[in-house]
Amino acid sequence: MNLFTHLFLISCGASLGAMSRHGLTLLLNPLFTFLSFGTLIANYIGCLIMGIMLAMFWHSSAFSTEYRLFFVTGFLGSLTTFSAFSAEVIENLLQHKWLEGITITSLHILGCLFFTTLGVFIWRYFQ
């Protein structure tokens, strides 16, 4: 595959990931504005899927480079956006909302580590 095919696959995956994240933000942020809930859930879902995919890649080398570029680099890279998370934390800290900033940071980091690990275990369970 050539560079343009790879860029096309990444772009297609990224478009779907960005639309998914935006949809989650519109749907969930109004429920818990304190937590930027849509971004949190997007990161949790993305990390869960990433854990499953990591376990799949470790288990089998049958997954093509193109598959990884579309799903991991494109879709998940766009769905789980660290820039949105960091912006939300910094906004809270600059407004002296220390508890909110620390809570968002803790939930994202610990939750994402948990869901990535859970994804690995889910894949192993079904093997």
From Swiss-Prot:
Note how its activity is modulated.
Na(+) is not transported, but it plays an essential structural role and its presence is essential for fluoride channel function.
Q: Which InterPro entries match?
A: FluC
GO cellular component labels: plasma membrane
Q: Provide one Gene Ontology biological process annotation.
A: cellular detoxification of fluoride
Q: Would you say which domain of life the source belongs to?
A: Bacteria
GO molecular function: any one?
Answer: fluoride channel activity
The catalytic activity, as recorded, is: fluoride(in) = fluoride(out)
Where Na(+) binds, per the record, is at G77, T80
Major site of localization recorded for this protein: membrane
Which family does the record claim for this protein? Belongs to the fluoride channel Fluc/FEX (TC 1.A.43) family.
State the protein's name.
Answer: Fluoride-specific ion channel FluC
Whose protein is this, by species?
Histophilus somni (strain 2336) (Haemophilus somnus)
Q: What is the lineage of its organism?
A: Bacteria, Pseudomonadati, Pseudomonadota, Gammaproteobacteria, Pasteurellales
Q: Which gene encodes it?
A: fluC
